[in-house]
Amino acid sequence: MRLSITLIFTLIVLSISFISAGNVFSHKQYQDSFIDWMRSNNKAYTHKEFMPRYEEFKKNMDYVHNWNSKGSKTVLGLNQHADLSNEEYRLNYLGTRAHIKLNGYHKRNLGLRLNRPQFKQPLNVDWREKDAVTPVKDQGQCGSCYSFSTTGSVEGVTAIKTGKLVSLSEQNILDCSSSFGNEGCNGGLMTNAFEYIIKNNGLNSEEQYPYEMKVNDECKFQEGSVAAKITSYKEIEAGDENDLQNALLLNPVSVAIDASHNSFQLYTAGVYYEPACSSEDLDHGVLAVGMGTDNGEDYYIVKNSWGPSWGLNGYIHMARNKDNNCGISTMASYPIA
């Protein structure tokens, strides 16, 4: 049973006695904010769900206030993930298995790349303006981010080569690339997906093979309806932002990042810089589609797969030339069409 607004108010009133003296806001401020947030995000809870979600919302409301009050150029807000604990968020939305590959060549060579010279001059490119990027998609509660990063880069290089931008099938990758090391909604790697597409001689379009937010037992690839092909792929030198930026001048690039922090979960605007980010423990696949500079702050334009209501209409500006913050150049790659 979903709760009515009246019953919600009753439950909130009953929870007053549990409010800690350490809370940042008054009971009424928490209450009003949560009700407004529920309405704007079309959220509805059962009786059992309500109080845990409300408690997590209050914690996130405090976190956002404390972060923003420090004057960071990264702005946080109460987005669609504001009723989730950080653990719940990581479990449901992150899924790049980068640690598998970092145990090999990339991790051993990471330290050799971080101190290479970086671009000093401002660089500006945005592949959205060149019709090489499809609209923001939504992976839902499935750790399929790697498949969206993969289709994004294949869509980009194909559009640049042919002049035609076609939305490609993430479901095709989810259902059919397990033999290449991917694990469906439990994560995978973009390079594994590239290997699958090469071996498979192509990928279906989103229209031909729609996304279902789950893995099917059967691969339903339509051999006679290939929408895009690639011949190979190139991996960026691990940790080398120079190499990543050179690649971005050519086409969009698939990147793996550390997105595990509350600051990423609740990102709303500004240039994202997280001092606690790891450059090796990577857990989310996204798509770098350009780069720019804002008031002296260099950034990458990064397309996420959490729908257009997250971040900057589905995008995030991530710090550029900041010692590979969040590992954005640790495991970057792009296909060759």
Swiss-Prot record:
Pfam families noted in UniProt: Inhibitor_I29, Peptidase_C1
Record-linked InterPro entries: Papain-like_cys_pep_sf, Pept_cys_AS, Pept_his_AS, Peptidase_C1A, Peptidase_C1A_C, Peptidase_C1A_papain-like, Prot_inhib_I29
EC number: 3.4.22.-
Keyword Disulfide bond: yes
GO molecular function terms attached to this record: cysteine-type endopeptidase activity
Enzyme class: hydrolase
Record keywords: Disulfide bond, Hydrolase, Lysosome, Protease, Signal, Thiol protease, Zymogen
One BP annotation, GO: positive regulation of apoptotic signaling pathway
S-S bridge residues: 142-185, 176-219, 277-326
Subcellular location: Lysosome
Main location: other
GO cellular component terms, semicolon-separated: extracellular space; lysosome
Source taxon at top rank: Eukaryota
Signal peptide from the UniProt entry: 1-21
Active site per database record: 145, 284, 304
Propeptide: 22-120
Family per similarity comment: Belongs to the peptidase C1 family.
Protein name per the record: Cysteine proteinase 3
Organism of origin: Dictyostelium discoideum (Social amoeba)
